Every structure is written in C-alpha cells, then in structure tokens.
Amino acid sequence: MVAWIATLIRAVDTRTSPPWLLLPLMTLWANLHGSFTFGLAMIAPIACDALWRAAHSERLNVFRQWTLFALLAVGAACLNPYGPEMILVTFRTVALGAALTTVTEWRPQNFTHLGAFEVIMLGAFGFALYRGVTLPVLRIVMVLGVLHLSLSQVRHADLLGMLAPIFLARPLAEQFTALAGDRTGLALRPSAWLPATAVLLLIGVTGLASLRHDVSPPARITPANAIHSTEIAKAGPILNDYDFGGYLDFVGTAPFIDGRGELYGEAYMLRHNRALSLENLPDFLRLLDEYHIGATLLTPSTPAVALLDRLPDWKRIYSDDVAVVHARR
C-alpha cells in the first residue's frame, strides 16, 4: 500500500506521467490482500490532484494518462483466481451494515480512555496549529479521508500513520524552508542500496520462515487447548464464537462462522450475535436444533455459556480462561 500510494504521489509532485511499471504491484497486491481496492480507489483523488496542478494546456493529456492508468490498474487487479469477483467482495463487506458493529475491528474508535491513536492525532493537530501548516486543497481531502476511515473503523487506524506522511511530505517540505531545496530532492531520491537491502532481507526472512513447520498461533489467545483436549470435531456441527472461527479454519474444522463476513451476510451474522448474547433466547434454542449443533466453542464471557450449563441436554466438557466447550448429552 505504501509503495503504491507513495509512487503515485511522487508522480504528481514531480509532474510526470503515471508510473506504468507500478501495475504489476497491483496484481501482486490483489493476490495477497483485499485492501487492494483501496489502492484502486485512491487513484481518483490522486489523479484529480495531478489535474489540479497541471497547466491548462496539459490537462487533457494528463486526464488521458491517468484514465488509462486507472483502467489498466483495474485490469491488473483482476489477474487473480477469482477475476473481477475480488473487487465486488469489498462492496459486499461494506453492505453488511449493522452486522459490522458486532465485529471489534469494524467498530469506531473508542475515546473513553486515552490511547496511542488519540495522542498521535492530537499531537499532529497541535503541531499543525502551532506551525500554521497549510496544504493544497486535494491533499487536505486525502488527509481528511484517511482520518475519517481511521476514526470510523478501528481496523483502518494504520492508514493515517502510513499514508498521511506521504500526502504531507512535499507540501511541508516546500512550506518550511529548513526542509526545502536540495533536501526535498534527496528525500524523493533515496539511495538504491536501501530498497535493495530491504528486499534481500525480506527474501531471507521469508525463506527461513518457510523452513519451519511448527508455526502456529499461541495457545493463550486461541482455543487450541480446548480443541486438542476434546473430540469436538467428532461431535457434529460446532457453534463457535466469532473470534474462534479463524482457528477452526486453521486446524481444518468447519466453523459455524468466521471472519469472512461477506460470505455469511448481514442477517446470518446478526442472528449469530443475538443468539449467543441471548438477546433472542428462543431463537438461540431454535438455532441449536436447526443446524443440528453437536458442540459449542465459546468464550467464558459469552452469555450463552451460563444457559448451556443449565440445559439438561447439554454438558460442559472443557473450560479454561480462553474457551468453554459444551456437548450434547
């Protein structure tokens, strides 16, 4: 993400055409992580910035270049096993609506306690006010855009830290004479050995990691002990806590739900959440029978755990600080 955005911003700052050699990076990104759609979306404001800065006589040519680049970037993103379907996943995720509020990483920032995000944000605001920072209009739009994402959803907090410096680097360097002149040019032209060293280090670490076959999540944050101490996989369909779905996938056991919310849909996710929190107790009992649940794997704080302890058809067969397992009698 940083390489993609930084290279596009540099093209705008240096008033050059979009970097066509960057397109393979989009293909790689699309095959690694769903955030590639953010990279596609950012082409629009960056292209508008390029148009804004271009001379009037050059704007038509700049528009054609960035439009072609955007189309090729979309095509590059479609070079994955699922084609254009991967782009649609983002829209299905956003369409989950109220179900997103049940997932911690999709909730808004919580400012009831002072945290690192708030300290950094307030510090940046204080610096801007103290030094009288001014920015071009479209850079303001970009910074406010990532700030909005960072405030509205916890999972996007990193965007502000990763991308805001990229948006601000050239405007601040031009505004503050101590950073202007040759220093700006040097900042935009790093020595070749630095990225080369980083690439070699990445290849080396990846190669060493691939030789290990004992890599697994730590037991203190996963239901590993609960699963290995019981025969829960043989009990039948498992009703699991949302946070345990990924680990069940990891060990090859089918979960009731996992982090791929776009596959389950809003109604399914909300029903699961309301059932386990006993907001709808009758539906929780119906759910157990409807899906022929043979065992449950829940966190100790889940309200449904106390109810299962009292149901005659269920018995607790394992519990620790991480997970509680119930099975049908």
Model-derived segments and spans:
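Short periplasmic/luminal acceptor-recognition loop of GT-C membrane glycosyltransferases, typified by
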Residues: 231-269, 293-301, 326
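Short hydrophobic alpha-helices at membrane interfaces in multi-pass membrane enzymes
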Residues: 10-27, 62-68, 137-144
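Hydrophobic/aromatic-rich transmembrane helices and adjacent perimembrane loops
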Residues: 42, 149-177
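Membrane-interface alpha helices of multi-pass inner-membrane proteins
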Residues: 19-34, 72-77, 144-150
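Periplasmic/luminal catalytic loop of GT-C fold multi-pass membrane glycosyltransferases
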Residues: 269-322
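Membrane-interface transmembrane helices that cradle and orient dolichyl/undecaprenyl
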Residues: 2-19, 125-131
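Transmembrane catalytic cores of multi-pass membrane glycosyltransferases
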Residues: 34-133, 161
